[in-house]
């Protein structure tokens, strides 16, 4: 992107730092992927069996090709997990997280059958919004960037050109009028607030200006001497302690949707022209109610834009503000990447169809809004990318999946295989059994497994059958739980943890194939009605379900069926193919499969331990836990010089925030706060040991 060239991008190498080295199939997969990417192949598929370390292979691939990378995943939870893995593997590089910043989102819609208009309603997660800004900031200021994103990255975002044009460059010794800088900050949608200093605001104290950019947790202090910038510092917003001195810094706008006065006035003129044209069409069709409704709503929005520079739902006028022709694609995160970026699509069998489906789902809702006079036709240009537009914007692509779809297999010239697990574990043995007497057979298998302290997953086709089976097993003394759609997210995490710990032995569910579900204690997966063709018994679903038993040395899968369907045959053949390769490799290299030792802990455990430790430490400091003051999240960096009282207060505040984040299921934020609390407590203990607290 040409405008980004005026920013001095930091160029640092991608470097994987890990105690582990590539093992099993990983070295060969990394070498082949690297060769094919460097040879210019546009589409490459990595067929990686469950548990073979596809994420680590991706990190080593990025290290080899040294290119900015976008990793697309199917949902926010997996995006957070993957971002954390990459941060551990590439600690010196920028690993960013870009997902929808809505905790709750109800788009505006009109239901013609009942004449019901539903207003837009949403709640924005400020921490996720910061991470989105952090991603675009990183992409424009450095090359060593990995962005882990959901399909949110193909939805409209302000133009990178306007984002850069709205940026201000601060350089030590440069001439700059203080008042001009304040006006510039306001035009960038930062608010002056001398009392409540938080992200997205600035404050002024004489010749000193301080600002917290939208994408930062630390503040920037600019000290003037007349019309010259005398000093620039990065400082802690809570304690005011200077972290480091700076020579040059960029401050980007507080919103991705920035438009200068000239661009806004041109947009208003274009909106007025479209309104007049659309009213003519509606009136000619005798749609007088719709015409009046459109006139009132659009005129109100125009008045807001003229007076305030923005209006609610301004994104519906994005094509006019961007100056785009009707029907052309919106700008999105992909436009912030340099031309040579690499795209990695994780779990491509799910994510690729998801990308293609976004446009039609959005259009069906907006057509009603336009037809009934709630929006101008140009509102339909505020949309996700179409599939062909997405393809035009991406270059070389790596598809990752244990079960690649027909699309990606058709695009690539053969696939790269990653079948061998570093632990030597092999794919489970698949046994097909008749449906007659299946429940009694299942009960016998459960007793065999539980006697060896192993766990069992059972997957059924219907909610009714799952409930009846759970009741039947309970009646026969089996410790069993039922996982269904009514169980909330936090309880699901707890159920899986309790299964691993042995609180119960059997988990019954309808769709237990969830990609990324790690349960090493599970040695048997039983699939009831395996011969009933459909989504839950497709070859892809069956292979994913079989993978849930691949974490155990003695893993087995029992399919109960009276005939072998095409889906079953494909799933069994593929599993046996992988199993044969794995057994041959282990025999040749003298490898004895090792059980996967995955720590039984989740964020709820860690928070409880952290809380007990905090109470003990604060008691030793002569303090008691009080209510936190809800201060905005801050980093623990550079607090060595802070008094003990400040540290105690900060620990209390961050602990409150940690529990609030966990309660709202924001586990990534809770984990980060837990780590910051740990660092602060380490410093407080050192002060206590030295007799300063």
UniProtKB/Swiss-Prot annotation:
Superkingdom assignment: Bacteria
Name used for this protein in its record: UvrABC system protein B
This protein's domain notes: The beta-hairpin motif is involved in DNA binding.
GO cellular component, one term: cytoplasm
Residue positions of motif Beta-hairpin: 101-124
Annotated NCBIfam families: PRK05298.1, uvrb
Summary of the function given for this chain in its UniProt record: The UvrABC repair system catalyzes the recognition and processing of DNA lesions. A damage recognition complex composed of 2 UvrA and 2 UvrB subunits scans DNA for abnormalities. Upon binding of the UvrA(2)B(2) complex to a putative damaged site, the DNA wraps around one UvrB monomer. DNA wrap is dependent on ATP binding by UvrB and probably causes local melting of the DNA helix, facilitating insertion of UvrB beta-hairpin between the DNA strands. Then UvrB probes one DNA strand for the presence of a lesion.
Ranges of residues in domain Helicase C-terminal: 438-604
Keyword vocabulary terms for this entry: ATP-binding, Cytoplasm, DNA damage, DNA excision, DNA repair, Excision nuclease, Helicase, Hydrolase, Nucleotide-binding, SOS response
Positions annotated to bind ATP: 48-55
Recorded family membership: Belongs to the UvrB family.
Gene this protein is translated from: uvrB
One BP annotation, GO: SOS response
First-listed, main subcellular location of the protein, grouped into a coarse class: cytoplasm
Entry GO MF terms: ATP binding; ATP hydrolysis activity; DNA binding; excinuclease ABC activity; helicase activity
Residue ranges of every copy of the UVR domain listed in the record: 648-683
Subunit-structure text: Forms a heterotetramer with UvrA during the search for lesions. Interacts with UvrC in an incision complex.
Organism: Arthrobacter sp. (strain FB24)
Cell compartment(s), UniProt: Cytoplasm
CDD domains: DEXHc_UvrB, HAMP, SF2_C_UvrB
């Amino acid at each position: 992107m040409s405008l980004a060239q005026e920013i001095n991008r930091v160029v640092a190498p991608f470097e994987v730092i890990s105690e582990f080295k590539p093992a099993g199939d990983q070295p060969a997969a990394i070498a082949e992927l690297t060769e094919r990417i460097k040879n210019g192949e546009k589409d490459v598929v990595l067929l990686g069996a469950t548990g073979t370390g596809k994420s680590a292979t991706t990190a080593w691939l990025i290290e080899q090709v040294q290119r900015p990378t976008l990793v697309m995943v199917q949902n926010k939870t997996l995006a957070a997990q993957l971002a954390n893995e990459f941060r551990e593997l590439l600690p010196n590089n920028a690993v960013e997280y870009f997902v929808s910043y809505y905790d709750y989102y109800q788009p505006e819609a009109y239901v013609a059958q009942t004449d019901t208009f539903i207003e837009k309603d949403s709640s924005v997660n400020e921490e996720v919004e910061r991470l989105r800004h952090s991603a675009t900031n990183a992409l424009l200021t450095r090359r060593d960037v990995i962005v882990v994103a959901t399909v949110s990255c193909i939805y409209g975002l302000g133009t990178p050109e306007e984002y850069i044009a709205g940026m201000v460059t601060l350089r030590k010794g440069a001439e700059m009028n203080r008042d001009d800088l304040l006006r510039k900050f306001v035009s960038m949608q930062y608010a002056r607030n001398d009392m409540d200093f938080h992200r997205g605001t600035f404050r002024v104290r004489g010749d000193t200006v301080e600002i917290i950019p939208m994408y930062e947790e630390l503040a920037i202090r600019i000290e003037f001497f007349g019309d010259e910038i005398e000093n620039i510092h990065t400082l802690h917003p809570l304690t005011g302690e200077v972290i480091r001195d700076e020579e040059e810094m960029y401050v980007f706008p507080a919103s991705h949707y920035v438009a200068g006065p000239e661009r806004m006035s041109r947009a208003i003129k274009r909106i007025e022209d479209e309104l007049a044209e659309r009213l003519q069409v509606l009136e000619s069709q005798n749609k007088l109610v719709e015409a009046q409704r459109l006139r009132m709503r659009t005129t109100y929005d125009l008045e807001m834009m003229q007076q305030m520079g923005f209006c609610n739902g301004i994104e519906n006028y994005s094509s006019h503000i961007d100056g785009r022709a009707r029907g052309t694609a919106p700008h999105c995160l992909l436009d912030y990447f340099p031309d040579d970026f690499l795209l990695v699509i994780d779990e491509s069998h799910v994510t690729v169809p998801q990308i293609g489906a976004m446009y039609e789902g959005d259009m069906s809702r907006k057509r009603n809004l336009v037809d009934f006079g709630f929006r101008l036709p140009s509102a339909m240009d505020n949309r996700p990318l179409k599939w062909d537009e997405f393809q035009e914007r991406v270059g070389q692509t790596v598809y990752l999946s244990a079960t690649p779809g027909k699309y990606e297999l058709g695009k690539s010239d053969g696939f790269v295989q990653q079948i061998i697990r570093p632990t030597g574990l092999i794919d489970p043995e698949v046994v097909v059994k008749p449906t007659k007497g299946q429940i009694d057979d299942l009960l016998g298998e459960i007793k065999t497994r539980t006697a060896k302290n192993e766990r069992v997953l059972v997957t059924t086709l219907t909610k009714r059958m799952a409930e009846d089976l759970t009741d039947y097993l309970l009646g026969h003394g089996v410790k069993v739980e039922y996982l269904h759609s009514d169980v909330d997210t936090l309880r699901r995490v707890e159920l899986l943890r309790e299964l691993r710990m042995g609180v119960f032995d059997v988990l019954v569910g309808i769709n237990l194939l969830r990609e990324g579900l790690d349960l090493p204690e599970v040695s048997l997966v039983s699939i009831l009605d395996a011969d009933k063709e459909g989504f839950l018994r497709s070859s892809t679903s069956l292979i994913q379900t079989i993978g849930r038993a691949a974490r155990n040395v003695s893993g087995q899968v029992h399919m109960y069926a009276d005939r072998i369907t095409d889906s079953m045959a494909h799933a069994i053949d593929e599993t046996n193919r992988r199993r044969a390769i794995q057994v041959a490799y282990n025999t040749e290299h003298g490898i004895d499969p090792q059980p996967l030792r995955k720590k039984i802990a989740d964020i709820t455990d860690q928070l409880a331990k952290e809380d007990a430790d905090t109470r003990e430490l604060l008691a030793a400091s002569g303090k008691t836990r009080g209510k936190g003051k809800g201060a905005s999240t801050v980093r623990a960096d550079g607090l060595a010089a802070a008094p003990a009282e400040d540290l105690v207060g900060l620990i209390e505040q961050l602990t409150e925030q940690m529990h609030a984040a966990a309660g709202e299921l924001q586990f990534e934020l809770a984990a980060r706060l837990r780590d910051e609390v740990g660092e602060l407590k380490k410093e407080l203990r050192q002060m206590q040991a030295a007799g300063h607290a």
